[in-house]
Amino acid sequence: MAVTTTLRDGIAVVTFDNPPVNGLGLDVRRGLAEALAAANADEAIQGVVLTGGGRFFSGGADIKEFNTPRAGQAPSLHDVIAAVESSVRPVCAAINGTALGGGLELALAAHYRVARRGGEVWLPEV
């Protein structure tokens, strides 16, 4: 699975794992949207932590899906970002490595952010 949720003391730790850079492809976007909806519906969950598997938080868009039908399927990254911003549970982005482009946008949508030493954040589009 591209997205897994682990419960730890009332916190939903949502890990997205789409090697090599945790690209935000359709499976990851769907998994994140579903995990956020489930956390918001569960009164026992007090907060959500978003983190990437491996060395990257997220490298942004999944270039393997460029110019394919999957790229335009819902939910869009904008939809996922809106879900993070409007979550009734506090969301913390645990930036475990590099966060680029849409990956940084996802982290910025969270209510809180923490980063490991040596992690990089940047917008290559700028």
Segments from the language model and where they lie:
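Hydrophobic/aromatic residues within transmembrane alpha-helices
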Residues: 14, 50, 62, 106-107
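Beta-strand-connecting loop/turn residues
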Residues: 9-10, 55, 119
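Conserved CoA-thioester-binding segment of acyl-CoA-metabolizing enzymes
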Residues: 1-51, 67-68, 79-82
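Glycine-rich beta-to-alpha active-site loop
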Residues: 84-126
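Glycine- (often His-adjacent) and acidic-residue-rich active-site loop
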Residues: 52-83, 99
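Alpha-helix capping and helix-loop boundary segments enriched in small/acidic/polar residues
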Residues: 23, 67-71, 95-98, 126
